[in-house]
From Swiss-Prot:
This is Glutathione peroxidase 6. The gene is Gpx6. Its main location: secreted. It is found in: Secreted. Transmembrane segments: none annotated. Expressed in the Bowman glands. Its EC number is 1.11.1.9. InterPro entries: Glutathione_peroxidase, GPX_AS, GPX_CS, Thioredoxin-like_sf. PROSITE patterns: GLUTATHIONE_PEROXID_1, GLUTATHIONE_PEROXID_2, GLUTATHIONE_PEROXID_3.
Amino acid sequence: MTQQFWGPCLFSLFMAVLAQETLDPQKSKVDCNKGVAGTVYEYGANTLDGGEYVQFQQYAGKHILFVNVASFCGLTATYPELNTLQEELRPFNVSVLGFPCNQFGKQEPGKNSEILLGLKYVRPGGGFVPNFQLFEKGDVNGDNEQKVFSFLKSSCPPTSELLGSPEHLFWDPMKVHDIRWNFEKFLVGPDGAPVMRWFHQTPVRVVQSDIMEYLNQTRTQ
């Protein structure tokens, strides 16, 4: 009786786990397309205080990590981790660039002038100051998306088959290559071409490990 009962149960459990792995709708990381026309050096953005327009050409020869950020997201704790990544990878010519966006759950509601104060005193709080460049708040999806994100998204496959619940997403039209949520990341190589794209929930330590593995591979080629 016991063996007759457990046999089908174990088989069902095995099939459920197998199905879950097979139908996993997301990947922690995807490689970007090879031979994409153009580079990020054709684009630029205004710094968060609006005081300077930065042409991304000035990062030529470096690796750039583009991140869309938000101050009131469950992933806002990622900010200190990005500080650590920037500090530890700076010797390897890696620069983190942050782009505040309010299109995901309306989680970046403040003005540009309020964002740094919110980070310092509210979330993450505790006097936090980002050690990487932040740019003006803007769209990363939809009709008014920043052109650099149009380029990045067209250069890399999406990390997830699912776009998310429409009631929490604020742009139109919605496209398959769109960014899914706050804190998605794109790595651009020293030639200005996109290299990798990470799912927003991929831990920063994994992102850092992936970058280091990539840097080690490029040194040996």
